[in-house]
Swiss-Prot record:
This is Putative pre-16S rRNA nuclease. Pfam families: RuvX. GO terms for molecular function: nuclease activity. Belongs to the YqgF nuclease family. It is found in: Cytoplasm. PANTHER family: POLYNUCLEOTIDYL TRANSFERASE, RIBONUCLEASE H-LIKE SUPERFAMILY PROTEIN. It comes from Moorella thermoacetica (strain ATCC 39073 / JCM 9320). Coiled coil: none annotated.
C-alpha cells in the first residue's frame, strides 16, 4: 500500500512516497504553492500516478504541544485535500523535522541552493517514515 507524506508550508509542499509495501519513505518532489486549486490538482495527479491509498500530513505543533496558526492552516488544507482525493488523511507531529532535515543536508555537504531545493522533500520523508515506523510498532 502506497502512502504519501506531505510537509505543507506557506510557499512549498514537500512530498514523499512510501515503497509499495509501506516500509520505507523516499522524497519525491517539492510543489511550489500557487493557489489552493492548483495545489490540490498537483497532489491529486501524484496520488493518481502513484496509486496512493493514504496521506500523512505533518502537523506543525508548538514545542509545548499546542496548535498555532500554521497548524490550523495545515488542518484546513488537509480537509480540502481529503475532499478532493477521497482518501484517508492522517496527521503526524512534525516538530523538528525541518531542523533534522537541515542537519542531514548540511552533513551531506550540499550547497545552500541545493538544500533549499530539497529540504521540504526531506522533511516530508521524515514525517512519512515516522508514521510508517509507528504503524510497524503498532502492528497495523
Amino acid at each position: 500500500m502506497r502512502i504519501m507524506g506531505l510537509d505543507v508550508g506557506t510557499k512549498t509542499i514537500g512530498v514523499a512516497l512510501s515503497d509499495p509495501l509501506g516500509w520505507t519513505a523516499q522524497g519525491l518532489t517539492t510543489i511550489r504553492r500557487r493557489n489552493l486549486a492548483a495545489d490540490l490538482a498537483a497532489l491529486k495527479e501524484l496520488v493518481r500516478r502513484y496509486g496512493v491509498e493514504e496521506l500523512v500530513v505533518g502537523l506543525p505543533r508548538n514545542m509545548n504541544g499546542s496548535l498555532g496558526p500554521q497548524a490550523e492552516a495545515v488542518r484546513a488544507f488537509a480537509r480540502h485535500l481529503q475532499a478532493e482525493v477521497g482518501l484517508p488523511v492522517h496527521f503526524f507531529d512534525e516538530r523538528l523535522t525541518t531542523v533534522a532535515a537541515g542537519r542531514v543536508l548540511l552533513e551531506a555537504d550540499l550547497s545552500r541552493r541545493r538544500r533549499r531545493q530539497v529540504i521540504d522533500q526531506v522533511a516530508a520523508t521524515y514525517i512519512l517514515q515516522g508514521y510508517l515506523d509507528r504503524l510497524g510498532q503498532n502492528g497495523v
